[in-house]
Amino acid sequence: MLINMSQPLSLGIESLAEWATVQTSYDDPQGFLELYNNCCPQGLEASQCHITQTKPNIAGKVIASDYFIKNDKAVEIKEILENINKKPFFMEVKSKSGVYEKDVSPLIYRIKADADGIYLLSAFGNTNLRCDRFTEKLNQAFNLDIKLRDVTRLNQYVDQNGELKEVGEYIKGLL
């Protein structure tokens, strides 16, 4: 059996939308789900199991993620946040060649704020806006005091014909 998990998040970020691809000869989805959940580590239980006609390659196809960032101060800078992707927004990026400033505004697809916090749709996958580093930058720039435990990934998306499609819907198209 071969299990491929979706790309990992930083330690401390909760997720409601993780996906795995399992290559197995087992042909009973419900039976596999029960066996898997009985053997997997706590917190990695599966809620769905589907047999697809082709290999979904979810980890390679995911290009965006939705996040909720709990923060009651975000509403105070709602207008600033909701326009953050309309002009350059620079963050420090560390790479093998050193540290440099990068404009991450093209990686922010949508951002909204209300009294509960921030809703962020951003690049994820091969081109990635790391949510942990983005929240660090928000803390520095706007004094929001966001902790990693305040961040929850709500969904993941693939590109299908130039449109974002939820991974669950993408999988249903492969059944």
Protein language model annotation of sequence segments:
Residues Q30-C40, I77-K86, F134-L138:
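Short amphipathic alpha-helices in soluble, non-transmembrane regions
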Residues L2-S6, K86-L175:
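Core RNA-modification/binding signature centered on pseudouridine synthases
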Residues Y36-E76:
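Hydrophobic, well-structured mid-protein blocks that either form specific transmembrane helices
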Residues L16-A20, I63-S65, F89:
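A generic structural signal for short beta-strands and their flanking turns/coil linkers
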Residues L16-E18, D28, F32:
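Generic hydrophobic, aliphatic-rich segments that mediate packing or membrane embedding
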Residues M1-Q23, T52-N57:
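Short, charge-patterned binding micro-sites
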Residues G12, N57-K61, R110-A113:
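Short, conserved, surface-exposed binding loops centered on an aromatic residue
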Residues T21-D28, I69-A74, L120-N126:
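Short beta-strand-to-loop capping motifs
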